[in-house]
């Protein structure tokens, strides 16, 4: 149908490359190409805004410091005033596996630095920047603090973090929940066949370590996908009935299943895609050595794939006579119910 050409005939990106940064758990550059002219800016801007505003994270929302009534106080034996201490507390990076508010405590005696690593946490909370300096204590000085940690998204100012029944001395803190700290993107020209008028989108994502850059990008894309679904106000025409199945295949029909249906991690799936491994039949003919030569493909991804294949009774390095078959896409559709 003519209507379907609106989306079916557009160029779709078929290459996604993840380049780890100086700290792979926090920084990565993701390159997607080719894109229709203008789509690089459209997608890059949308992904950037969602990455910075809409991902869930954890942050300190309030603090109570023994002997302190308000944030404009000073503490005997502590070189920083309370305002500076609160500013430092705002930058504590936290990973929390619970949606419920949690408490953390800190108690330390001088002299010396007080760091985020001195905070006592419970099992499902982790401090990601333990070297962060909160304040400095003189000889004989002591400081005790109790923090409230909550989960949310985006930026929430301190006045919205003050409970209605807040006790005297509770200091609300500006909360930056987003695990993404910085996002930038650039658009370059790229080639699609003989056509040089296509976009290449390069995005650099930095996080606080609570989530990997590539996973953060995947979550942002899913958010956009879900938000746009309501605008699709039509059903696509049903495809014609499939032709009768062939009586026999010379290999397991499961080999016709696409690897992107295996529910692999984002990194493993991207590595297979960049190596043009589309079907399970393509994958199992690869040896372990060949897989490890794939860019950005490590031992962790290898073990993950081996486990998934083993659950299907398959393994790497298999010999599959008759692979790949002719009309593989048609065969995959016809035998879909068999796997």
Swiss-Prot record:
Location of region: Alpha C-terminal domain (alpha-CTD): 251-339
Gene3D superfamilies noted in UniProt: 5' to 3' exonuclease, C-terminal subdomain, DNA-directed RNA polymerase, insert domain, RNA polymerase, RBP11-like subunit
GO cellular component, one term: DNA-directed RNA polymerase complex
EC number assigned by the record: 2.7.7.6
Transmembrane segments: none
Gene Ontology terms: biological process: DNA-templated transcription
Pfam name, any one: RNA_pol_L
Record's keyword terms, sorted: DNA-directed RNA polymerase, Nucleotidyltransferase, Transcription, Transferase
A Gene Ontology molecular function term of the record: protein dimerization activity
Reaction equation(s) it catalyzes: RNA(n) + a ribonucleoside 5'-triphosphate = RNA(n+1) + diphosphate
Keyword Electron transport: no
Residue numbers spanned by region Alpha N-terminal domain (alpha-NTD): 1-235
Domain notes: The N-terminal domain is essential for RNAP assembly and basal transcription, whereas the C-terminal domain is involved in interaction with transcriptional regulators and with upstream promoter elements.
Quaternary context: Homodimer. The RNAP catalytic core consists of 2 alpha, 1 beta, 1 beta' and 1 omega subunit. When a sigma factor is associated with the core the holoenzyme is formed, which can initiate transcription.
NCBIfam families reported for this sequence: PRK05182.1-2 (NF003513), PRK05182.2-5 (NF003519), rpoA (TIGR02027)
Family per similarity comment: Belongs to the RNA polymerase alpha chain family.
Protein purpose: DNA-dependent RNA polymerase catalyzes the transcription of DNA into RNA using the four ribonucleoside triphosphates as substrates.
Name of protein: DNA-directed RNA polymerase subunit alpha
